[in-house]
Amino acid sequence: MAKIVIKVGSNLLVKPNGDIDKSYIIELSRTIAGLKKKGNSCILITSGAKAAGYGKAQKANCEEELYIKQALCAIGQVQLMKLYELAFDMYDEKVAQILINRDDFGHRQRFLNLRNTLIGLNEMGFIPIANENDTVATSEITFGDNDILAAMTAIGWKSDYLFLLSSVDGLMDDQDRLIKVFTKDVVLKKMEKTQWGSGGIETKIRAARAASAAGVRGCICNGRDLSAIERFLAGQNPGTGFEPSKKPASKKAWIGFLSHTKGEIIINNGAKRALMMKKSLLPVGIVDVKGSFEIGDVIDVRTVDGEKIGRGIVNFSSSQTRGIMGYQSSQLTQQLNRSGSTCIVHVDNFWLVPE
């Protein structure tokens, strides 16, 4: 059966007065439990910790210093998980909490540990409930919004479906018509962020497009009507669908969509052609190096015009690459005083931007 990631935001979980909507959590839990009983594997990405923290601490507004907001998230996360545990208990399902930050995806070993944990929880029959680890998040390591966290989880877990639940039916065009299938040339109606959420419809689009590019079928739909999930799985389209590309290999999916990049390598047209023909990146095709990186880091590869060609794991540091760029491989064996390959990025460690 299918592997499904479902993301629910604060706009659905929080009432207008700031309280967590317990009845909605019960209905969401019933829906996910039903999916699991049909043989599907599910992961829930939830927001709402900050709002729950405000309620527990009896704070009246959202304007607080960062350290207070982080403390409120720590308070609220406990309350939120209590509600989920009680709700899923009603349907004889067990849950597990996972708190994630951006670095957990960006470093490959931590990403593999996270993925193995998700696999293990599903094998044991637990439903993972994930949220960003707001208490330690900084601007450098934050997702910015749980839509992005959901997309990265779906990519890393090699999910079949990603549902981004919204307070509207899906994406609307500039004529106020529902867009059934997203294409990059659609003209969207402008929509606003909610009080309790940190993202908007643009973030949902970015998340769904990233997941679909990695082979995950996406849907932005109305979370007030949770039957939309079952209907989409049955082949209907109650929201806005995002058609998936072919799934890349697991390692290349990590390189292309989850890794942190430490710099850039600028290449000429000959190197671009070679990479598009699934060949390795050699020193002769490099015209510039930007940033500082070490062996094993991930870098972006761009043309002199700024076009992003892909990402790859480098076999040389930035200083080494600067020293050998432009040289033919045959010239480098003696200069480097080393045997073996002189390719900067091997084709097996390179992710090519989909056309």
Question: Residue locations for each model-derived region?
Answer:
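C-terminal catalytic "cap/lid" subdomain
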Residues: 1-94, 98-355
